[in-house]
From Swiss-Prot:
Region Disordered: start-end pairs: 1-38, 347-460
Species of the source: Mus musculus
PANTHER family attached to this UniProt entry: RAN BINDING PROTEIN 9-RELATED (PTHR12864)
Domain notes: The SPRY domain mediates the interaction with MET.
Name this polypeptide is given: Ran-binding protein 10
Keyword Transcription applies: no
Length: 620
């Protein structure tokens, strides 16, 4: 038998070892991609950057009598096999992450060799590899020659049938209750071990010549239906969560949840929804309606790419805010530069009829400096470009033919008109009502409030808080540049070709001049506050767009995606709230963040139930 199964890796103890299936640093092979998809489906809670999953046997963590081949998945014995002192084992490349919850691998017996002294199981780091799994402390194994299980002892216990050539033995580790069971040819054999410690490695051991086994860590579908077993335990864990007792203080619990929902709606500017929710639940709103609408107006401008107008509106509604937040001002100005390249900021859209803002702000205007206040302006009407949404997909209602530069908005914009109704708070809490005018210095003037019909940023208009620009359609989180504004005179093989500013020389000069002023602002902030590497990187990324004739397709073109407006919008919104002594983050988001962090800590502590209590499972 030994001669018939000649040692595939005879000679050097490490002969036949390969690199573990890596593709030489290039693109992953189709097999590796399929493995990654299968592991992601089986173990979605595992962060493989922090805790990689076992994918192969380790060429560095084995006894010399073990040889590896076929991507370090095949194990063969190359020792003498005279007695138990010739036993040899190998561990997997990584321990089993606790975040798996349930972990499973299978081993196929390619050849039982001379005597079939094979062991399949688990072991901790540092356990002697000159032994079969299960013989030493923190080592566990199921042996093929007698069907016994070995739990950290040289004395085995009757467990299951023997196994031989052609059999497939599976090993399932339940990190929720600390147990392990085996399968043979797809059928469970029952619990083998209990009270298992954390951080165990899949392990196999061989002892006689000719023994060969192949491992399956997910490279191929398993014989055993592990996903059905996972569903069973997921239901148990989620049942525990749902059954958590709160009946004794149900009213208090509901009040907390209602306040969290209300504050979330207010934070993101869903004014009408927050008002309706407050009426239904009798929940007080901790901010005046006029102030919510002011923030809503500013967010809308940023999400539309009209950052220059957003800056001016912020300075008008909340004077001193940007002057006391130079980092925020610089972020906004860099974003404005990007939007000018994108053709969405009014500085390049309105060159033919310059607004007072354009004349006051550039060039040589102090408005770039955080030391100076706002300049007067009007807000452009967005009626022609206002987005709508169908089934969660944003689209534009602009009936005009698309050119690279949309016609400038009328100066008689309805968004600059004042509301005839005086602002009022909605179910405003008594404890905060006396301080409302102090905390919101300009929110109570009638010429700053805009009607609900114009300003309400409901979900149907802003899917997930992202507004679609004229040039980009957002479909399920992906961007399709199928409605790009192009200079009709610029054609490449019969197709429109995008150009910087649509080839408009005046707009290009406007961008260059603005860039010089932005550079001057960066230098000024450096002198006053010291060098800021984040500012330098932000500026370089923005300026790099000018190095390409088609910035949308360049290596830094991701900056032009509308989704990049979201972090800027969130930072500005949080700063406004913080300036009014309101939370800069909604409590609901803080609670979700805390829950996610608790699950990460559970995984690090080896508590496997964290895998089946993911926050995403409760977000609908």
């Amino acid at each position: 038998m030994a001669a018939a199964t000649a040692d595939p890796g005879a000679g050097n103890p490490q002969a036949g070892d390969s690199s573990g299936g890596d593709s030489g640093g290039g693109l992953p092979s189709p097999g590796e991609q399929e493995l990654s998809r299968r592991l992601q489906r089986l173990y979605p809670a595992v962060n493989q950057h922090e805790t990689p999953l076992p994918r192969s046997w380790s060429p560095k963590d084995k006894y010399n009598y073990i040889g590896l081949s076929q991507g370090n998945l095949r194990v063969h014995y190359k020792g003498h096999g005279k007695n138990h002192k010739d036993a040899a084992s190998v561990r997997a490349t990584h321990p089993i992450p606790a975040a798996c919850g349930i972990y499973y691998f299978e081993v196929k017996i390619v050849s039982k060799g001379r005597d079939g002294y094979m062991g399949i199981g688990l072991s901790a780091q540092g356990v002697n590899m000159n032994r079969l799994p299960g013989w030493d402390k923190h080592s566990y194994g199921y042996h093929g020659d007698d069907g016994h299980s070995f739990c950290s002892s040289g004395t085995g216990q009757p467990y299951g049938p023997t196994f031989t050539t052609g059999d497939v033995i599976g090993c399932c580790v339940n990190l929720i209750n600390g147990t392990c069971f085996y399968t043979k040819n797809g059928h469970s054999l029952g619990i083998a071990f209990t009270d298992l410690p954390a951080n165990l490695y899949p392990t196999v051991g061989l002892q006689t010549p000719g023994e060969i086994v192949d491992a399956n860590f997910g490279q191929q579908p398993f014989l055993f239906d592990i996903e059905d077993y996972m569903r069973e335990w997921r239901a148990k864990v989620q049942g525990t969560v749902h059954g958590f007792p709160i009946s004794a203080r149900l009213g208090e619990w509901q009040a907390v949840l209602q306040n969290m929902v209300s504050s979330y709606l207010v934070h993101h500017g869903y004014c009408s929804t927050a008002t309706a929710f407050a009426r239904m639940t009798e929940t007080p709103i901790q901010e005046e309606q006029a102030s919510i609408k002011n923030r809503q107006k500013i967010q809308k401008l940023v999400l539309e790419g009209r950052v220059g107008e957003a800056i001016e509106t912020t300075q008008r509604f909340y004077p001193g805010l940007l002057e006391h937040n130079p980092n925020l001002l610089f972020m906004l100005k860099c974003r404005q530069f990007v939007e000018m390249v994108n053709g969405t900021d009014s500085e390049v859209r309105s060159l033919s009829s310059r607004s007072p803002k354009s004349q006051d702000s550039y060039p040589g205007s102090p408005s770039l400096s955080p030391r100076h206040g706002p300049s007067s302006s009007h807000i452009h009407n967005t009626g022609a470009d206002s987005p709508s949404c169908s089934n969660g997909v944003a689209s534009t209602k602009n009936k005009q033919n698309h050119s690279k530069y949309p016609a400038p908005s009328s100066s008689s914009s309805s968004s600059s008109s004042s509301s005839s109704s005086s602002p009022s708070s909605v179910n405003y809490s008594e404890s905060n009502s006396t301080d409302s005018t102090k905390s919101q210095p300009h929110s109570s003037t009638s010429n700053q409030e805009t009607s609900d019909s114009e300003m309400e940023m409901e979900a149907e208009h802003y899917p997930n808080g992202v507004l679609e620009s004229v040039s980009t359609r957002i479909v399920n989180g992906a961007y399709k540049h199928d409605d790009l504004q192009t200079d009709e005179s610029s054609m490449d093989d019969g197709h429109p070709r995008r150009q910087l500013c649509g080839g408009n020389q005046a707009a290009t000069e406007r961008i260059i001049l603005f860039g010089r002023e932005l550079q001057a602002l960066s230098e000024q902030l450096g002198r006053e506050y010291g060098k800021n590497l984040a500012h330098t990187e932000m500026l370089q990324d923005a300026f790099s767009l000018l190095a390409y004739s088609d910035p949308w397709s360049c290596p830094v073109g991701h900056q032009l995606d509308p989704i990049q407006r979201e972090p800027v919008c969130a930072a500005l919104n949080s700063a406004i709230l913080e300036s009014q002594n309101l939370p800069k983050q909604p409590p609901l988001m803080l609670a979700l963040g805390q829950a996610s962090e608790c699950l990460r800590l559970m995984a690090r502590a080896g508590l496997g139930s964290c895998s089946f209590a993911r926050v995403d499972d409760y977000l609908h």
